[in-house]
Amino acid sequence: MMTTPSDLAEFALGFAYTEGLIERRADVYDIEIEPQGHGAAIIVRMTVSSACFAQLKAARRTLLGRTGCGLCGVDSLAYFEQQPAANPNREASRLDIGLLDAVLARFERLQIMRNQTGTTHAAAWVNWQGEVVLLREDVGRHNALDKLIGALLDRDAHPSDGFVLVSSRASYEM
């Protein structure tokens, strides 16, 4: 996978979660990051529960070509017939547009890599008071979101405590 070499443990955790390979942080026993010499290659090894490993072996999705519309690598369109669980939190429907405008005004300044390179996407976790609690960046928009989700899993954050803001388009699978 091509990713920016920061927050790799969070990326691995978030990626495993969003791909349905794990259900919770406790499913992951260990994450090892191994730089490979002087090149850009880094190996990330993850040790998961035996149940999660069996699920991984049974998966029928290739992860090549994961950018784009979300259809690449999907074995069947039945994948898209799955309905996401309803969010019992009503805060999202009452999100104040002024609060969102204020967050957006600060959002770009908080993107350190983007400000240095102009080439990254960001995903941020924002609480209902408008504070950017966490922000992760990557050259790939999916990767930035996976890094953020991994960071949230590491902190045992609850989805109803805030919302996600991304600097890119949010395609179907995101």
Predicted features and spans:
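Positively charged, proline/Ser/Thr-rich regional signature most characteristic
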Residues: 124, 137-144
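Catalytic beta/alpha-barrel core
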Residues: 73, 138, 163
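Short, solvent-exposed amphipathic alpha-helical segments in soluble enzyme
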Residues: 5-7, 16-18, 140, 149-154
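Intrinsically disordered, low-complexity regions enriched in acidic/Ser/Thr/Pro/Gln residues
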Residues: 1-123, 127-128, 132-135
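Feature captures the catalytic cores and cofactor-binding loops of soluble hydro-lyases/lyases
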Residues: 141-174
